[in-house]
Amino acid sequence: MNVSFITQYTSSIDADAAILLQVEKFEKTFGLELVDPNRIIKKGYLIENFQGSFGSQIKFLYLEGSPFAFVKVVGLGKEQSINDETWLKAGGLCVSEIKNYPKKVVVFADALGIDVSTTQIMNFVLGALLKQYSFECYYTDKKKSKQKNKNILELVIITKNAENCQKELKQVQAICEGVNLTKELVNEPANILGTEEFVEKIKKLEKLNVKVQVLDKEKLKELGMNALLSVAQGSSRPPYLVIMQWNGSDNKEEEPLAFVGKGVVFDSGGISIKHSSGMEDMKADMGGAGTVVGLMHTLATRKAKINVTGVVGLVENMPSCHAQRPGDIVTSMSGQTIEVINTDAEGRMVLADVLWYCKTKIQPKLIVDLATLTGAIRIALGEQHAGLFSNNEALAKQIIKSGEATSEKVWQLPLGLEYDKLIDSKFADMKNSSGGSAGSITAAQFLKRFVDEKTPWAHIDIAAVCMGNKLNEFNNSWASGFGVRLLNYLIKNYYEQK
């Protein structure tokens, strides 16, 4: 979908549809006189008792005297409640449910009754762009399509901030591309996206000047990454460690920020096999890696002025005569030994070695890891927040604020010695599962043993927000693409060169 910005409407635009935005109970609507010279819409307001509450909509076809065949008015809600998230959702709402009508849509964006900023307009555009994505490539019957806005080819935004918005457009498009790439990776079935196929997807980033390094099984053995390898040994699919480098800083030698992703392309649970109910969702157990790849795409596309390294560990966790067993003890890359209590607590085994590699080989300024790590995080926080754990309060606060700014919210949970002792083992340095309460916390506590206090580190458990959520105002997809927008905001607003 093409997007453009203008300061005022002219008949030469020749659009099929118009969208107006209404602040709740405010008397006037920007663009109403032009769109509806015969004042029919106002009568519709009265008949339908339309007042502009958030998400409310009223639609009109072929209004007499109107230059548009289709007109929709969307409510923004009460003035004091309108924020950046409102505009993100409004963008998705505005392009929804208008199939069969427009090819070109004009949006009168400067809603009367409030001061509309460039940031809010760009959130609106992002919401509209994100809403366009759907994963329907495996339908042979195209009538099953749930996408209701495929016909929109061009979105024309009318705003006094047109010039500034045009300057920001490429940034927003880059974010959308990264989110959609993450969604695509998470949505793909595991028979299509195995470890080797995932590597090939990542290599496409090289076209954007991202340096990609792939370490295979033999190299992982040389490095002593036995925790990661132990997870992979039950599958015929080979394990990989993939390092992605974007050097956008003026100082190419500057310490990078590092983002680590869990990439279990399918998680059966291994010998500690999962229940069959819902196991199909475990194709998304590579969601953390998917987010890191999407983030790297966004940073490279918008040419971020910073050095960033993404590292993902790719494995498949399957039961077989070669699979690891409960009771096995493995020596991680760090030299610390791990007793395997539960083969379904595999993500932390992968991350243990990846985090240690990141800390010792890359030596970054900070590390943020993302993983669909625990089912317990859904019990603790539901689907509204990801879980956040950190050894650095300044970094944690930055991530929390970034989540609030992008509507990808996180909630910080505690770490401490009381939890750490729960993963002590009778036979090794630690065990991979405490087997009791505080499952998300003890999993994070396990990861903490593979980073040090000198390096700011944060772990984001995205198991409840990565996939399977209810569709919302700006997402049509089973996969949410969670994390790309949050981390891009974190980088741009707290670390990137201005």
From Swiss-Prot:
Keywords linked to the UniProt accession: Aminopeptidase, Cytoplasm, Hydrolase, Manganese, Metal-binding, Protease
Keyword Nucleotide-binding listed: no
Keyword ATP-binding appears in the UniProt entry: no
GO cellular component: cytoplasm
GO biological process: proteolysis
Positions annotated as active site in the UniProt record: 274, 348
Protein name (record): Probable cytosol aminopeptidase
Origin species: Phytoplasma mali (strain AT)
Recorded name of the encoding gene: pepA
